[in-house]
């Protein structure tokens, strides 16, 4: 099975920003080796909720169904059984078969007016405590499709009153229920809707009808970071350091809110209009006040030793993923990628990888301090932000129209 190019804001079949190019391959993995990984409790395949899956795919690991620790999601009503309307597995546009009895919700009841630096508009949302905006499909003008996925589609949209440009994700309840990933959607909505950071894609709210769930998201016109990596093959030190700095700042914020992402990879990162990085997919994230979990999830190439060995894990899994991502930025492929998933597991367990000669010594130092078998020995996020390689190379572009430093 090939690697996923999950696209929140650019379709695989509609060339929006630049032509799609084929990226590095990934070895298909239906489940982890029984001799090395604690087998999942359920037989539910781990499907991606957001973004297309009709393109080369990096295979997700089969996983248990995580439950929010000490947290009851407010989005429990998202996937109530449909009482009317025709459900179909064939993707439709959001304007087709409109249901007059739409149920609308806002997952952000205390939001102030949000100004978009990307579009220069403001999305009017409730400011008063307890007041909820009752969204419905008629509130939006639907534009061109941005992406097509296994569970639905993504559309460019504009809120009628404010003219705010956004992305509207349309997910089909029948397909979500068939795949058994309702819990994943609820968790994603619950977590992402409460996060406010310039390097995290904003989820403004959601609404649903008998057949579909609609997610109201920021529009990131720069598209998916993975496609940019495919286009450039690899990034230089300046561009890599800038992205790692922005991601470290976003993860530091998430961890302060007791949120573990657990699936950091290029496919889950988008670029804003100024080239800034944005975390866009929280499908595998978890709010874990207990800080210790055993669920196996994420992508094979990015799994840390403690997860493939079935040990308890905490927010330090994101430090490992940050190290893998930094290596992939600089080299163009993950450090533990091999011809077989068994060998990949072995190399991860042994932390066995090599650097090409063109990787700088300072970059090697940062990666090596993140890719530690013992989670407690990994460089913390504050240490990442203070690392000499990051400080030296992560200068922000001065002008909006200027390319990122080191862009190839």
Curated annotation (Swiss-Prot):
InterPro entries: Aur-like, AURKA, Kinase-like_dom_sf, Prot_kinase_dom, Protein_kinase_ATP_BS, Ser/Thr_kinase_AS. Pfam families: Pkinase. It catalyses: L-seryl-[protein] + ATP = O-phospho-L-seryl-[protein] + ADP + H(+); L-threonyl-[protein] + ATP = O-phospho-L-threonyl-[protein] + ADP + H(+). Residues 140-390 form the Protein kinase domain. The active site is at residue 263. PROSITE patterns: PROTEIN_KINASE_ATP (PS00107), PROTEIN_KINASE_DOM (PS50011), PROTEIN_KINASE_ST (PS00108). Keywords: ATP-binding, Cell cycle, Cell division, Cytoplasm, Cytoskeleton, Kinase, Microtubule, Mitosis, Nucleotide-binding, Phosphoprotein, Serine/threonine-protein kinase, Transferase. GO terms for biological process: cell division; meiotic spindle organization; mitotic centrosome separation; mitotic spindle assembly; mitotic spindle organization; peptidyl-serine phosphorylation; protein autophosphorylation; regulation of cytokinesis. One of its GO terms (molecular function) is ATP binding. Its EC number is 2.7.11.1. Residues 1-128 are annotated as: Disordered. Signal peptide: none annotated. It is found in: Cytoplasm, Cytoskeleton, Spindle pole; Cytoplasm, Cytoskeleton, Microtubule organizing center, Centrosome. It comes from the Eukaryota. Its main location: cytoplasm. Interacts with kif2c and kif11. This is Aurora kinase A-B. The gene is aurka-b.
């Amino acid at each position: 099975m090939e690697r996923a190019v999950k696209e929140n804001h650019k379709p695989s079949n509609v060339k929006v920003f630049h032509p799609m190019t084929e990226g590095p391959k990934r070895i298909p993995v239906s489940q982890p080796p029984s001799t090395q990984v604690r087998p999942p409790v359920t037989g539910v395949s781990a499907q991606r909720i957001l973004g297309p899956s009709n393109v080369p795919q990096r295979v997700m690991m089969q996983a248990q169904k995580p439950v929010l620790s000490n947290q009851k999601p407010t989005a429990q009503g998202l996937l109530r059984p449909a009482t009317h309307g025709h459900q179909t597995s064939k993707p439709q546009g959001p304007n087709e078969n409109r249901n007059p009895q739409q149920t609308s919700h806002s997952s952000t009841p205390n939001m102030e007016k949000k100004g978009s630096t990307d579009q220069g508009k403001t999305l009017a949302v409730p400011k008063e405590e307890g007041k909820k905006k009752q969204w419905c499909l008629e509130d939006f003008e639907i534009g061109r499709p941005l992406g097509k996925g296994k569970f639905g589609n993504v559309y460019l949209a504009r809120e009628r009153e404010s003219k705010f440009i956004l992305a509207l994700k349309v997910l089909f309840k029948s397909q979500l229920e068939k795949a058994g990933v309702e819990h994943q959607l609820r968790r994603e909505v619950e977590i992402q809707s409460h996060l406010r950071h310039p390097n995290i894609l904003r989820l403004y709210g959601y609404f649903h009808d008998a057949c579909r769930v609609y997610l109201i998201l920021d529009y990131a016109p720069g598209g998916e970071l993975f496609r940019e990596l495919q286009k450039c093959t690899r990034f230089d030190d300046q561009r890599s350091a800038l992205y790692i700095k922005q991601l470290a700042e976003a993860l530091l914020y998430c961890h302060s809110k007791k949120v573990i992402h657990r699936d950091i990879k290029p496919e889950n990162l988008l670029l804003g209009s100024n080239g800034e990085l944005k975390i866009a997919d929280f499908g595998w994230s978890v709010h874990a006040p207990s800080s210790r979990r055993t669920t196996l999830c994420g992508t094979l190439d990015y799994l840390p030793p403690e997860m493939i060995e079935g040990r308890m894990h905490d927010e330090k899994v994101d430090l490992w993923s940050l190290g893998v991502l930094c290596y992939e930025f600089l080299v163009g492929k993950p450090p533990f990628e091999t011809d077989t998933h068994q060998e990949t597991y072995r190399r991860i367990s042994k932390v066995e990888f090599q650097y090409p000669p063109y990787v700088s010594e300072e970059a090697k130092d940062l990666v090596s301090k993140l890719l530690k078998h013992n989670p407690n020995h990994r460089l913390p996020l504050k240490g990442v932000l203070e690392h000499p390689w990051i400080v030296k190379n992560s200068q922000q572009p001065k002008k909006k129209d200027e390319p990122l430093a080191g862009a190839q």
